[in-house]
């Protein structure tokens, strides 16, 4: 990501409510690549993903009720600097596109896959043209596809929040759909991601505040959940991993983003946020991508880079987090100023 990112100018009401959130983000563990980029003019943004090339971003806009079949959902496309290049790059009701309430997305090669109620749709990421439509079995009532994860081997996984199910899709076999797991313990699976080490599925629960691990054959294990006397999580929405294997989870109701480090320590890296939905991580540019569902905006911000130069016991400075520049290094002897 280039360092001369230009901050979007917010409309007055949003600017007043949003600036304090940015301050909290900066002070709780995120760094700023030049300037944090804010994106406005959205409509109920749900998911924010990056092209693996690091040259483009996409935001899904529900534009109405999350279960409405109104054919007015759209996808916003941004360039490498986070500037909107096409607000309605893909739009329901235009050019025979049927797109009701687009939620989770995943990029695989040239195809942008989008979860839309009871169908998975694939569009060409360059032209925006529809490439494939995948329908799902209706064995479980209340089909509500929520998020998508792409595995390294080419398989896709889709969460179904209403049916407490996870589906596996094989694009190489004509996008065949198989039910991977149907279990009430999923408790409304929302965001899903692939664990970078185990290649297991990780999903977060909307209803019970759980984080669950799912093996390739559908075996469930609870990684984290609320205790009897504690309510750490409420309505978990998004989950993703950075390039070092740290996990990030968003709670849309509590307005928090959590980080779970590789040694299973939890940290709140941002709070008092206005409904952070299905977050994404740009692992190429080390950025967190946050859609703010109820204020119709989104944000790109830098993540802390782990430092191996300091021991765990050594105090870290603001420079380690990127908030202030580090002190200048002494110049070699004989160098003229």
Which residues does each PLM region occupy?
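WD40 beta-propeller blade core
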Residues: 76, 121-122, 167, 212, ...
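Residue position within the beta-strands of beta-propeller blades
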Residues: 58-60, 114, 158, 203, ...
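Blade-level signature of beta-propeller repeat domains, shared across WD40, Kelch, NHL, RCC1
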Residues: 280-324
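Short loop/turn segments that connect beta-strands within beta-propeller blades
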Residues: 79-82, 124-128, 170-174, 215-219, ...
